A protein has these predicted regions:
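Bacterial N-terminal signal peptides that target proteins for export
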Residues: 2-14
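Bacterial N-terminal signal peptides
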Residues: 11-23
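Disulfide-stabilized, aromatic/cysteine-rich ligand-recognition loop
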Residues: 29-30, 258-264, 285-331
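Short, polar loop/linker segments at the starts of domains and inter-domain junctions
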Residues: 44-61, 222-236, 302-320, 351
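Active-site microenvironments of metalloenzymes and redox enzymes
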Residues: 51-52, 58-188, 194-222
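Short, well-ordered junction/capping motifs at the entry into regular secondary structure
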Residues: 117-119, 170-178, 224-227, 232-272
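A short, hydrophobic C-terminal helix/tail in secreted or cell-surface proteins
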Residues: 333-350
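Short, charged juxtamembrane terminal tails flanking transmembrane helices
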Residues: 354-357
Length: 357
Protein backbone atom coordinates (compact mmCIF):
# COMPACT_ATOMS: atom_id res chain seq x y z
CA UNK A 1 0.00 0.00 0.00
CA UNK A 2 1.36 3.46 -0.89
CA UNK A 3 1.81 6.19 1.71
CA UNK A 4 -1.29 7.91 0.32
CA UNK A 5 -3.45 4.99 1.45
CA UNK A 6 -1.89 4.56 4.89
CA UNK A 7 -4.21 3.81 7.83
CA UNK A 8 -3.24 7.14 9.36
CA UNK A 9 -4.45 8.98 6.26
CA UNK A 10 -7.77 7.13 6.26
CA UNK A 11 -8.23 7.73 9.98
CA UNK A 12 -7.66 11.44 9.41
CA UNK A 13 -10.35 11.40 6.73
CA UNK A 14 -12.84 9.71 9.05
CA UNK A 15 -11.96 12.09 11.89
CA UNK A 16 -12.70 15.05 9.63
CA UNK A 17 -16.11 13.64 8.77
CA UNK A 18 -16.91 13.07 12.43
CA UNK A 19 -15.81 16.61 13.27
CA UNK A 20 -18.29 17.92 10.73
CA UNK A 21 -21.05 16.04 12.53
CA UNK A 22 -19.99 17.40 15.90
CA UNK A 23 -19.81 21.05 14.81
CA UNK A 24 -23.18 22.45 13.77
CA UNK A 25 -23.02 24.89 10.87
CA UNK A 26 -25.44 27.77 11.35
CA UNK A 27 -26.19 30.61 8.96
CA UNK A 28 -24.95 34.08 9.84
CA UNK A 29 -27.43 36.04 11.95
CA UNK A 30 -27.74 39.62 13.18
CA UNK A 31 -27.55 38.43 16.80
CA UNK A 32 -25.20 35.81 18.19
CA UNK A 33 -25.83 34.55 21.72
CA UNK A 34 -22.69 33.15 23.34
CA UNK A 35 -23.72 30.08 25.32
CA UNK A 36 -22.11 27.97 28.03
CA UNK A 37 -23.08 24.39 28.81
CA UNK A 38 -24.39 23.62 32.28
CA UNK A 39 -23.70 19.96 32.99
CA UNK A 40 -23.69 17.85 36.14
CA UNK A 41 -27.29 16.79 35.63
CA UNK A 42 -29.16 15.51 38.64
CA UNK A 43 -27.73 17.92 41.22
CA UNK A 44 -29.70 18.49 44.41
CA UNK A 45 -31.44 21.71 45.37
CA UNK A 46 -29.68 24.32 47.45
CA UNK A 47 -30.94 24.94 50.99
CA UNK A 48 -33.04 27.75 49.46
CA UNK A 49 -35.07 25.12 47.61
CA UNK A 50 -33.75 26.06 44.16
CA UNK A 51 -31.12 24.85 41.71
CA UNK A 52 -31.89 21.19 40.99
CA UNK A 53 -31.83 20.41 37.25
CA UNK A 54 -31.81 16.82 35.98
CA UNK A 55 -30.60 17.50 32.41
CA UNK A 56 -27.83 19.34 30.61
CA UNK A 57 -28.69 22.66 29.02
CA UNK A 58 -27.07 25.85 27.78
CA UNK A 59 -27.44 29.40 29.01
CA UNK A 60 -26.25 32.78 27.83
CA UNK A 61 -22.72 33.62 28.88
CA UNK A 62 -23.80 37.26 29.04
CA UNK A 63 -26.96 39.31 29.50
CA UNK A 64 -28.67 40.28 26.23
CA UNK A 65 -27.19 43.60 25.19
CA UNK A 66 -28.59 46.90 24.00
CA UNK A 67 -27.15 46.29 20.51
CA UNK A 68 -28.77 42.86 20.32
CA UNK A 69 -32.14 44.22 21.39
CA UNK A 70 -31.85 47.09 18.88
CA UNK A 71 -31.26 44.53 16.12
CA UNK A 72 -34.42 42.74 17.26
CA UNK A 73 -36.43 45.97 17.16
CA UNK A 74 -35.16 46.87 13.71
CA UNK A 75 -36.19 43.42 12.47
CA UNK A 76 -39.75 43.30 13.84
CA UNK A 77 -40.81 46.70 15.16
CA UNK A 78 -41.09 49.04 12.18
CA UNK A 79 -44.63 49.07 13.50
CA UNK A 80 -44.32 48.26 17.19
CA UNK A 81 -47.66 46.51 17.64
CA UNK A 82 -46.90 44.97 21.04
CA UNK A 83 -44.77 47.69 22.66
CA UNK A 84 -41.37 46.05 22.50
CA UNK A 85 -39.78 49.49 22.77
CA UNK A 86 -40.14 51.61 25.90
CA UNK A 87 -39.35 55.32 25.61
CA UNK A 88 -37.39 55.11 28.87
CA UNK A 89 -34.75 53.18 26.89
CA UNK A 90 -33.77 56.61 25.55
CA UNK A 91 -34.80 59.02 28.30
CA UNK A 92 -33.56 57.43 31.53
CA UNK A 93 -29.92 58.44 31.81
CA UNK A 94 -28.89 55.64 34.18
CA UNK A 95 -29.59 52.94 31.61
CA UNK A 96 -30.34 54.74 28.30
CA UNK A 97 -29.22 52.95 25.17
CA UNK A 98 -31.75 52.97 22.29
CA UNK A 99 -33.39 55.90 20.54
CA UNK A 100 -36.37 55.61 18.21
CA UNK A 101 -36.48 57.40 14.86
CA UNK A 102 -38.14 57.20 11.46
CA UNK A 103 -41.87 57.48 10.90
CA UNK A 104 -44.98 55.40 11.63
CA UNK A 105 -44.74 52.15 9.69
CA UNK A 106 -41.01 52.65 9.18
CA UNK A 107 -39.68 53.16 12.71
CA UNK A 108 -35.94 52.72 13.21
CA UNK A 109 -33.86 52.12 16.33
CA UNK A 110 -30.31 53.30 16.98
CA UNK A 111 -27.85 52.65 19.80
CA UNK A 112 -27.09 55.78 21.82
CA UNK A 113 -23.74 57.16 22.86
CA UNK A 114 -24.52 57.44 26.56
CA UNK A 115 -21.21 58.28 28.25
CA UNK A 116 -19.60 55.99 25.70
CA UNK A 117 -21.05 53.42 23.32
CA UNK A 118 -24.03 51.80 25.02
CA UNK A 119 -24.20 48.78 22.73
CA UNK A 120 -22.49 46.20 24.93
CA UNK A 121 -24.41 47.10 28.08
CA UNK A 122 -27.46 45.05 29.12
CA UNK A 123 -30.90 46.03 27.86
CA UNK A 124 -33.44 47.06 30.51
CA UNK A 125 -37.06 48.32 30.63
CA UNK A 126 -38.31 44.97 29.33
CA UNK A 127 -41.14 42.90 30.77
CA UNK A 128 -41.76 39.14 30.68
CA UNK A 129 -43.76 39.47 27.45
CA UNK A 130 -40.97 41.33 25.65
CA UNK A 131 -38.44 38.73 26.77
CA UNK A 132 -40.71 35.93 25.51
CA UNK A 133 -41.03 37.69 22.14
CA UNK A 134 -37.26 38.09 21.87
CA UNK A 135 -36.91 34.36 22.64
CA UNK A 136 -39.52 33.58 19.96
CA UNK A 137 -37.65 35.69 17.43
CA UNK A 138 -34.40 33.90 18.20
CA UNK A 139 -36.09 30.47 18.12
CA UNK A 140 -37.63 31.34 14.73
CA UNK A 141 -34.25 32.18 13.20
CA UNK A 142 -34.35 35.99 13.58
CA UNK A 143 -36.88 36.72 10.81
CA UNK A 144 -37.71 40.21 9.57
CA UNK A 145 -41.30 41.39 9.34
CA UNK A 146 -44.36 42.44 11.33
CA UNK A 147 -45.04 41.06 14.79
CA UNK A 148 -46.99 37.89 13.97
CA UNK A 149 -46.97 34.14 14.61
CA UNK A 150 -43.85 33.57 12.49
CA UNK A 151 -41.73 36.29 14.09
CA UNK A 152 -42.63 37.18 17.69
CA UNK A 153 -46.03 35.76 18.62
CA UNK A 154 -45.17 32.07 18.65
CA UNK A 155 -42.08 29.91 18.75
CA UNK A 156 -40.89 29.21 22.28
CA UNK A 157 -44.06 30.78 23.73
CA UNK A 158 -47.56 31.19 22.28
CA UNK A 159 -48.01 34.81 23.35
CA UNK A 160 -50.40 35.44 20.44
CA UNK A 161 -50.96 39.17 20.85
CA UNK A 162 -51.15 39.19 24.64
CA UNK A 163 -49.31 41.73 26.76
CA UNK A 164 -50.97 41.10 30.10
CA UNK A 165 -52.75 38.41 32.07
CA UNK A 166 -51.62 34.83 32.61
CA UNK A 167 -48.37 33.89 30.92
CA UNK A 168 -48.25 30.79 28.70
CA UNK A 169 -46.22 27.64 29.26
CA UNK A 170 -43.08 27.20 27.21
CA UNK A 171 -43.85 25.24 24.03
CA UNK A 172 -42.38 21.74 23.87
CA UNK A 173 -42.38 22.12 20.07
CA UNK A 174 -41.94 25.34 18.11
CA UNK A 175 -44.88 25.28 15.65
CA UNK A 176 -42.81 27.25 13.15
CA UNK A 177 -40.04 24.64 12.94
CA UNK A 178 -41.60 21.40 14.18
CA UNK A 179 -38.68 21.06 16.62
CA UNK A 180 -38.10 21.99 20.28
CA UNK A 181 -37.40 25.72 20.69
CA UNK A 182 -33.74 26.55 20.18
CA UNK A 183 -33.92 29.51 22.60
CA UNK A 184 -36.13 30.24 25.57
CA UNK A 185 -36.24 32.06 28.91
CA UNK A 186 -34.42 30.05 31.60
CA UNK A 187 -36.47 28.58 34.41
CA UNK A 188 -35.60 29.77 37.89
CA UNK A 189 -33.79 26.50 38.63
CA UNK A 190 -31.78 26.73 35.39
CA UNK A 191 -30.83 30.33 36.12
CA UNK A 192 -29.97 29.53 39.75
CA UNK A 193 -27.79 26.53 38.96
CA UNK A 194 -25.81 28.39 36.29
CA UNK A 195 -25.19 31.21 38.76
CA UNK A 196 -24.36 29.49 42.03
CA UNK A 197 -23.67 25.75 41.63
CA UNK A 198 -20.25 24.12 41.51
CA UNK A 199 -19.66 20.36 41.41
CA UNK A 200 -16.26 20.90 43.07
CA UNK A 201 -17.65 22.08 46.40
CA UNK A 202 -18.00 19.86 49.47
CA UNK A 203 -15.16 17.58 48.48
CA UNK A 204 -16.53 17.01 45.00
CA UNK A 205 -20.07 16.27 46.14
CA UNK A 206 -21.26 19.61 44.74
CA UNK A 207 -22.83 22.62 46.35
CA UNK A 208 -23.71 26.27 46.00
CA UNK A 209 -21.98 29.60 46.45
CA UNK A 210 -23.80 32.60 47.90
CA UNK A 211 -22.78 34.86 45.00
CA UNK A 212 -22.51 34.18 41.26
CA UNK A 213 -18.79 34.96 41.37
CA UNK A 214 -17.77 31.60 42.90
CA UNK A 215 -17.63 33.14 46.36
CA UNK A 216 -19.44 33.15 49.68
CA UNK A 217 -17.94 36.56 50.49
CA UNK A 218 -19.69 39.64 49.15
CA UNK A 219 -17.95 41.00 46.04
CA UNK A 220 -15.90 44.10 45.42
CA UNK A 221 -16.97 46.36 42.56
CA UNK A 222 -13.83 47.22 40.59
CA UNK A 223 -14.01 46.31 36.89
CA UNK A 224 -11.02 45.74 34.64
CA UNK A 225 -8.74 44.96 37.57
CA UNK A 226 -8.22 41.27 36.86
CA UNK A 227 -9.22 40.60 40.46
CA UNK A 228 -11.86 37.95 41.09
CA UNK A 229 -15.13 38.26 43.02
CA UNK A 230 -16.18 41.65 41.61
CA UNK A 231 -19.61 42.85 40.45
CA UNK A 232 -21.50 46.00 39.43
CA UNK A 233 -23.37 47.03 42.58
CA UNK A 234 -23.25 49.70 45.28
CA UNK A 235 -20.79 48.77 48.02
CA UNK A 236 -20.72 52.31 49.35
CA UNK A 237 -19.70 53.73 45.99
CA UNK A 238 -21.09 53.00 42.54
CA UNK A 239 -18.96 50.71 40.40
CA UNK A 240 -19.00 52.93 37.29
CA UNK A 241 -18.15 56.24 38.97
CA UNK A 242 -16.33 55.19 42.11
CA UNK A 243 -18.42 57.80 43.92
CA UNK A 244 -21.13 57.56 46.56
CA UNK A 245 -23.02 60.42 44.92
CA UNK A 246 -25.98 59.50 42.72
CA UNK A 247 -26.32 61.55 39.50
CA UNK A 248 -29.64 61.23 37.68
CA UNK A 249 -28.21 61.59 34.17
CA UNK A 250 -25.22 59.31 34.80
CA UNK A 251 -24.94 55.89 33.14
CA UNK A 252 -24.40 53.19 35.77
CA UNK A 253 -24.40 50.06 33.61
CA UNK A 254 -21.18 48.21 32.82
CA UNK A 255 -20.50 46.29 29.63
CA UNK A 256 -21.55 42.66 29.92
CA UNK A 257 -18.58 40.58 31.05
CA UNK A 258 -16.65 43.65 32.25
CA UNK A 259 -15.75 41.79 35.45
CA UNK A 260 -13.79 39.27 33.44
CA UNK A 261 -12.17 37.52 36.40
CA UNK A 262 -15.51 36.90 38.13
CA UNK A 263 -17.40 34.18 36.25
CA UNK A 264 -19.68 31.57 37.76
CA UNK A 265 -18.39 27.99 37.77
CA UNK A 266 -19.98 27.38 34.36
CA UNK A 267 -18.60 30.61 32.87
CA UNK A 268 -21.51 33.06 33.01
CA UNK A 269 -20.97 36.71 33.88
CA UNK A 270 -23.00 39.33 35.75
CA UNK A 271 -25.54 37.03 37.38
CA UNK A 272 -24.69 39.03 40.48
CA UNK A 273 -25.19 42.75 39.88
CA UNK A 274 -25.42 45.01 36.80
CA UNK A 275 -29.14 44.31 36.21
CA UNK A 276 -31.71 41.91 37.62
CA UNK A 277 -32.67 39.19 35.16
CA UNK A 278 -36.06 37.74 34.27
CA UNK A 279 -36.61 34.01 34.62
CA UNK A 280 -39.59 31.81 33.76
CA UNK A 281 -40.07 30.40 37.29
CA UNK A 282 -41.08 26.74 36.77
CA UNK A 283 -41.60 27.05 33.00
CA UNK A 284 -45.22 25.93 33.40
CA UNK A 285 -48.40 27.83 34.28
CA UNK A 286 -47.55 30.44 36.90
CA UNK A 287 -50.38 32.97 36.67
CA UNK A 288 -49.50 36.51 35.65
CA UNK A 289 -46.00 36.74 37.15
CA UNK A 290 -42.39 36.00 36.30
CA UNK A 291 -39.25 35.81 38.38
CA UNK A 292 -36.27 38.13 38.71
CA UNK A 293 -32.95 37.48 40.42
CA UNK A 294 -29.39 38.70 40.70
CA UNK A 295 -29.42 42.26 42.03
CA UNK A 296 -28.32 45.32 40.09
CA UNK A 297 -26.06 48.36 40.00
CA UNK A 298 -27.80 50.34 42.75
CA UNK A 299 -28.31 47.44 45.17
CA UNK A 300 -26.16 46.69 48.20
CA UNK A 301 -24.57 43.25 48.50
CA UNK A 302 -27.57 41.82 50.38
CA UNK A 303 -29.74 41.69 47.24
CA UNK A 304 -27.05 39.93 45.20
CA UNK A 305 -27.28 36.80 47.36
CA UNK A 306 -28.70 33.50 46.14
CA UNK A 307 -31.43 33.73 48.78
CA UNK A 308 -32.91 36.89 47.26
CA UNK A 309 -35.65 36.65 44.65
CA UNK A 310 -38.72 38.55 43.47
CA UNK A 311 -41.84 37.72 41.47
CA UNK A 312 -43.17 40.88 39.78
CA UNK A 313 -46.14 41.07 37.45
CA UNK A 314 -45.17 39.82 33.99
CA UNK A 315 -46.33 43.10 32.43
CA UNK A 316 -43.96 45.21 34.54
CA UNK A 317 -41.44 47.16 32.44
CA UNK A 318 -38.61 47.06 34.95
CA UNK A 319 -35.96 49.72 34.55
CA UNK A 320 -33.58 47.65 36.65
CA UNK A 321 -34.10 44.29 34.89
CA UNK A 322 -32.84 42.65 31.73
CA UNK A 323 -32.45 39.01 30.77
CA UNK A 324 -30.36 36.23 29.28
CA UNK A 325 -31.61 33.28 27.24
CA UNK A 326 -31.25 29.54 27.64
CA UNK A 327 -31.07 26.81 25.01
CA UNK A 328 -31.07 23.02 24.79
CA UNK A 329 -27.71 21.31 24.39
CA UNK A 330 -26.72 21.79 20.76
CA UNK A 331 -27.76 19.09 18.30
CA UNK A 332 -26.27 19.13 14.78
CA UNK A 333 -28.69 20.40 12.14
CA UNK A 334 -29.78 18.09 9.28
CA UNK A 335 -27.44 19.92 6.89
CA UNK A 336 -24.54 19.08 9.18
CA UNK A 337 -25.38 15.39 9.12
CA UNK A 338 -25.51 15.59 5.32
CA UNK A 339 -22.03 17.10 5.24
CA UNK A 340 -20.69 14.40 7.54
CA UNK A 341 -22.22 11.64 5.42
CA UNK A 342 -20.72 13.21 2.32
CA UNK A 343 -17.34 13.19 4.02
CA UNK A 344 -17.70 9.52 4.96
CA UNK A 345 -18.77 8.67 1.41
CA UNK A 346 -15.68 10.43 0.11
CA UNK A 347 -13.48 8.42 2.47
CA UNK A 348 -15.12 5.17 1.39
CA UNK A 349 -14.72 6.03 -2.29
CA UNK A 350 -11.05 6.83 -1.76
CA UNK A 351 -10.53 3.55 0.08
CA UNK A 352 -12.24 1.54 -2.69
CA UNK A 353 -10.21 3.23 -5.43
CA UNK A 354 -6.94 2.61 -3.64
CA UNK A 355 -7.76 -1.06 -3.04
CA UNK A 356 -8.69 -1.54 -6.70
CA UNK A 357 -5.18 -0.55 -7.82
Amino acid sequence: MSSSTSPARLLTCFALALALAASPVRPARAVTIDLVTVGNAGNANDTTGYGAVNYEYQIGKYEVTISQYAAFLNAVAKTDTYDLYNGAMASTGNIAGIVQGGSPGNITYSVLDNAGNSGNRPITYVNWWAVARFANWMANGQPTGPQNATTTENGAYAVNGNNDGDVPNKNSINPNTGLPPTFYMPTENEWYKAAYYSPTLNGGAGGYYTFATQSNDFPGNTSGSGVGNQANYNNGVYAVTGSADYVEAQNYLTDVGAFSASPSYYGTFDQSGNVYEWNDLTGTFIGNGGGVRGGNWFDIWFNLQSSRRSQPAAASDLGYAGFRLAAPVAVPEPSTYAMALAGLACCYSLFRRRRAR
